[in-house]
Structures are given as C-alpha cells and as structure tokens.
A protein has these predicted regions:
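A metal-dependent hydrolase metal-coordination microenvironment
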Residues: 1-100, 104, 190, 195-231, ...
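Active-site gating loops and adjacent loop-to-helix segments of metal-dependent hydrolytic enzymes
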Residues: 33-65, 102-143, 238-264
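Short helix-capping and hinge/turn segments at secondary-structure transitions, especially at repeat
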Residues: 76, 80, 106-111, 144, ...
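Surface-exposed cleft-lining segments at the edges of enzyme active sites
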Residues: 90-91, 139-148
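Short beta-strands and strand-loop turn motifs
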Residues: 138-140, 169-171, 194-197
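Conserved, well-ordered alpha-helix/loop/beta-strand core segments that scaffold catalytic motifs
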Residues: 144-177, 181-190
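Catalytic core of soluble alpha/beta enzymes
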Residues: 180, 204-207, 220-265
Length: 266
C-alpha cells in the first residue's frame, strides 16, 4: 500500500491483510523534485508510524489545500465550466484532486462542446483513462492549469526512506520523463534501489528501456499497476505483468530485510 504522501492507511491495511490472509508491504509514494522536475518516489517496507511520514503528509496536503481554489480558477480560465460544490463533494478533506475536477467537468452538459475536454471523451485520444489523463495533461507540471508546489529534494526523499527501513524505487519513470537515460542515471546516483519498469503508463518499449537500465546498475525492475479505482477504469488491481513476479517478491523482501524494514506476512 503506497498512498500519495501519506502512510496513514497502513494500520487499517494491516488489519485487513491479517483478516484476509494476505501479505502486506507498508509503503508510501513521496512527491519530490530533481532539478525542478517533479517525480514520485516509492518507499517499500517503511516503518509507517514514524513521525517523518506524518510530517510529509501535513506539509504536502497543507500546500494542496492552499492552492485548491487557484487550480479551480485556472481550469475555469480554459473555458471549462465547473460546478465547484460538486467538485468539493467528491473530495476527501479540504483539498481538490484533478481527477474529481475532470469527472465533474466531463459530466456537466454545459461542457459538451468544450474543445479542451474533447480528447477525454469516448473515442478521444486520451479517453482510455480520462480523469487521470486530464490531471497529467491539464493540471500536471507543464499543463495550462498547473499551479506549482514545493516538494522535497529527490535525494532527501531517498534518504528518508532508507533511514526509516524502506527501499526506494522510482515510480512510473516513463510518465515523468519518457525514455531519458541521462536523467535516470542522475537519479540512480542518489541511491535508488529500483525502477518501476512495469506499470500502466509504459508500453513494451518503455518497460524494456527501464528494465535494461535497472539490470545494468544491479537494481530491481519492479512493477506496479498504479491502480486508482474509478479514476483508472482500464486497470485491474495487481496487473501489469512482470516476467517473474515471485522472484521480484523474494528480492524485494530480502532488500527490505537488509534495510531493517517491515513486511507483514500472513
């Protein structure tokens, strides 16, 4: 379980895993920056109750709350009509999420002819996962409704994960930088333990590209479906095939053990 910038769900996940007879790796997905570019860093096997993770959540979600209205303003400036109360009704807490903005905008008949939303409607170029794609394209870094936030340095995030029992893996690199070897090499130099080569954002070529780099550096080539429920309707939980998931599981658990991290085995 690797929620964005939060480890708060781990106790509940641990109870459910025990009830269902499942193994559980506690984790987190930390938002961070390297040379001005945003990345997501997975921490597997962390001591989820350590105060540093609550501090990360407080900082990041505090920023998200502070910029929420600015994001809504920026989306409306593109000619998209928003029912703001409907957006807020979908959001947990008091910070908006781009997937909820997309859902409300696409369901509003007043936006039927909005050209900005055309790619996210059935048959459109970005309709495979319309809500998430809207978030990346419109509200993400470089998008027309992007509102910047300040995230911790990438190397600092790697160090925090290592210092608290975890294994540091770069999430969905192809989504952030396509196939960029020079930048990947720089990120590896910060102390990465793995690259998420197999995920829903990667085609076969991109998976092979990051698998090759991981192998060259003796890193794990991990997998993750990036399952987000309704936000990504084309993804089933636990999919996106690694050629040998059992071997990866064993290697990951061994690495977590070396870090004195945690894996809950049923």
């Amino acid at each position: 379980v690797t929620d964005h910038d939060s480890a708060r769900a781990i106790p509940e996940a641990r109870r459910e895993a025990a009830r269902l007879g499942l193994n559980l790796v506690p984790g987190i997905e930390i938002s961070c920056q390297y040379e001005g570019k945003n990345f997501h860093l997975l921490g597997y096997g962390i001591h989820a109750g350590d105060p540093v993770f609550a501090a990360i959540e407080k900082d990041v979600y505090g920023q998200r709350r502070s910029i929420s209205e600015k994001i809504l303003d920026a989306v409306e400036a593109l000619g998209i009509v928003l029912d703001r109360p409907a957006v807020w009704k979908l959001c947990s807490g008091d910070a908006v999420a781009s997937v909820h903005i997309a859902r409300v905008a696409l369901e509003d008949p007043r936006n039927a002819d909005c050209p900005v939303l055309a790619p996210y409607r059935p048959g459109g170029a970005r309709s495979d996962a319309p809500y998430v794609n809207f978030g990346w394209d419109i509200c993400g870094q470089g998008g027309p409704a992007f509102v910047p936030m300040t995230f911790m340095d990438f190397a600092q995030a790697v160090a925090i994960i290592h210092d608290h029992g975890g294994v540091a893996v770069l999430a969905h690199p192809g989504a952030n930088m396509k196939q960029n070897r020079p930048l990947t090499e720089k990120l590896i130099a910060t102390g990465l333990d793995g690259l998420e080569a197999y995920c829903s954002y990667h085609d076969e070529g991109t998976s092979a590209f990051y698998r090759r780099i991981a192998d060259e550096h003796g890193l794990m080539a991990t997998l993750g479906s990036d399952y987000h429920g309704r936000a990504k309707p084309h993804i089933r939980l636990g999919t996106y095939g690694h050629p040998d998931p059992q071997a990866l599981w064993v290697r990951l658990c061994q690495k977590i053990k070396q870090q004195h991290g945690e894996v809950y085995v049923s």
